[in-house]
């Protein structure tokens, strides 16, 4: 038993050395947010990353909690092509849940476990300037990222804080916009030239014929979309990954957040547990 523990530490050592001082942007969502054990393991993983010299930045989602709050308030959520229609009242609820509830819970849990987290949203210091998303028809106040101003993040990171970001952006008109958390995380990772972007999902990664694909280049990932291998909700995640890698992010990892300590297993082991997308070494 003892030698197993030593071997785990020795396997992690080269990765700890390689990533010391590097920035990781982590999108927290899916099963990892819903299951208590996975949620606790996520917090522990973040603390451990921090204490090994990595600079974690968290971007979180919260779709199910938003829908739950709407129902409690007697409002039926409306979706169009899988995207939430966000009118003025819905946007108020989105902001209340993401910024006022989920964000603060994550910050509190990190701080209770020995970290130093600060919660912000995309509106703070104009971190995320948004504009209306029209790709899927008129969804109301659903936005896409127009610009990221990462100065506030640099200030927090340099002062040893862990930024926790709710993906609510601000438009040029001063209005709040609901932004997809994967997209927000990818754009923030680009702006920070992060070493890694880690997307927590409800599946093991990118699958082909039921088998996990451990590594992909952006070109291979694109072909999987074209060939219909990557479908449904995985398409925007893979598109985010391709875009991030092509714009300066070292690697993107798509992993199952429902697995306890998924981040550590992916980052600090040779085999990993999910799909890594990065440019080919050649």
Swiss-Prot record:
It catalyses: N-acetyl-L-glutamate + ATP = N-acetyl-L-glutamyl 5-phosphate + ADP. Catalyzes the ATP-dependent phosphorylation of N-acetyl-L-glutamate. The record marks 27, 237 as: Transition state stabilizer. Signal peptide: none annotated. Gene3D superfamilies: Acetylglutamate kinase-like. It is found in: Cytoplasm. Pfam families: AA_kinase. It comes from Thermotoga neapolitana (strain ATCC 49049 / DSM 4359 / NBRC 107923 / NS-E). Its main location: cytoplasm. Belongs to the acetylglutamate kinase family. ArgB subfamily. Its EC number is 2.7.2.8. Keywords: Amino-acid biosynthesis, Arginine biosynthesis, ATP-binding, Cytoplasm, Kinase, Nucleotide-binding, Transferase. Pathway: Amino-acid biosynthesis; L-arginine biosynthesis; N(2)-acetyl-L-ornithine from L-glutamate: step 2/4. Substrate binds at residues 62-63, 84, 178. This is Acetylglutamate kinase. GO terms for biological process: arginine biosynthetic process via ornithine; L-arginine biosynthetic process. It is an enzyme of class 2 (transferase). One of its GO terms (molecular function) is ATP binding. One of its GO terms (cellular component) is cytoplasm.
């Amino acid at each position: 038993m003892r030698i197993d523990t030593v071997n785990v530490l020795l396997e992690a050592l080269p990765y700890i050395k390689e990533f010391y001082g590097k920035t990781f942007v982590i999108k927290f969502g899916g099963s990892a947010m819903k299951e208590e054990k996975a949620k606790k393991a996520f917090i522990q993983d973040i603390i451990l990353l921090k204490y090994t010299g990595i600079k974690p930045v968290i971007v979180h989602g919260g779709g199910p909690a938003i829908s739950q709050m709407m129902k409690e308030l007697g409002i039926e959520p409306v979706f169009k092509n899988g995207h939430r229609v966000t009118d003025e009242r819905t946007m108020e609820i989105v902001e209340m849940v993401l910024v006022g509830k989920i964000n603060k819970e994550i910050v509190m849990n990190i701080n209770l476990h020995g970290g130093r987290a600060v919660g912000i949203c995309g509106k703070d210091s104009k971190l995320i300037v948004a504009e209306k998303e029209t790709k899927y028809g008129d969804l109301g106040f659903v936005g896409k990222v127009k610009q990221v101003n990462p100065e506030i993040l640099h200030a927090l990171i340099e002062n040893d804080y862990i930024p926790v970001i709710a993906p609510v952006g601000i438009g040029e008109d001063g209005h709040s916009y609901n932004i997809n958390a994967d997209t927000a995380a990818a754009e923030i990772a680009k702006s920070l030239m992060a070493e890694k972007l880690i997307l927590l999902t409800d599946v093991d990664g990118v699958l082909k014929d039921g088998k996990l694909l451990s590594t992909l280049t952006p070109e291979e990932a694109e072909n999987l979309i074209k060939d219909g291998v990557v479908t449904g909700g995985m398409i925007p995640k893979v598109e985010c990954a391709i875009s991030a890698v092509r714009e300066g992010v070292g690697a993107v990892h798509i992993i199952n957040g429902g697995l306890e300590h998924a981040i550590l297993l992916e980052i600090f082991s040779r085999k990993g547990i999910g799909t890594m997308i990065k440019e080919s070494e050649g």
